[in-house]
Swiss-Prot record:
Belongs to the Turandot family. A humoral factor that may play a role in stress tolerance. This is Protein Turandot Z. GO terms for biological process: cellular response to heat; cellular response to oxidative stress; cellular response to UV; innate immune response; response to bacterium; response to heat; response to oxidative stress; response to UV. Residues 1-23 form the signal peptide. Keywords: Immunity, Innate immunity, Secreted, Signal. The lineage of its organism: Eukaryota, Metazoa, Ecdysozoa, Arthropoda, Hexapoda.
Length: 141
């Protein structure tokens, strides 16, 4: 009997310690989400927004599908995240450069008017902010 009581106490302590470890990880990710949210509001640079979006998506991927999550809301967010990933390819933290056709793309890009380039960057920023805002709402509200 004495052994069973000691064993249950040890198991209870181990259970509490593992629970606190997960809570700390969630707390660290929660703090990181808040930092990224502030950076997202402060910056209008397309590359910065894409980096923020991919980091936020990484945190979302880590916690999605956990017990007690809103399945309908999560399905809509998954659709939005997958659409964003499909349209915005990032390699090693920077937007994809085009590989072997880089020179041809560069020549074409040089001929594109500056206002079109600016509009394209604005659209990229808006899409990245939209995805990050949806994930912020999912976690922070």
């Amino acid at each position: 009997m004495y052994f069973a009581i000691r064993l249950s106490f040890v198991l209870a302590v181990l259970f509490c310690l593992t629970g606190n470890g997960n809570a700390r990880m969630l707390g660290a990710d929660f703090n990181r989400l808040q930092q990224l949210q502030r950076r997202s509001h402060q910056s209008n640079d397309a590359n910065t927004q894409l980096k923020i979006a991919y980091e936020v998506i990484g945190i979302y991927d880590k916690y999605k599908g956990q017990k007690g999550s809103d399945l309908l809301r999560e399905a809509q967010l998954n659709s939005e995240v997958n659409d964003f990933k499909r349209k915005n390819v990032v390699v090693d933290g920077v937007p994809a450069q085009g590989g072997g056709i880089k020179d041809a793309v560069k020549k074409i890009a040089d001929e594109v008017p500056d206002d079109v380039k600016k509009n394209a960057k604005d659209i990229a920023v808006k899409i990245a902010k939209s995805v990050t805002k949806s994930i912020f709402k999912y976690f922070l509200n």
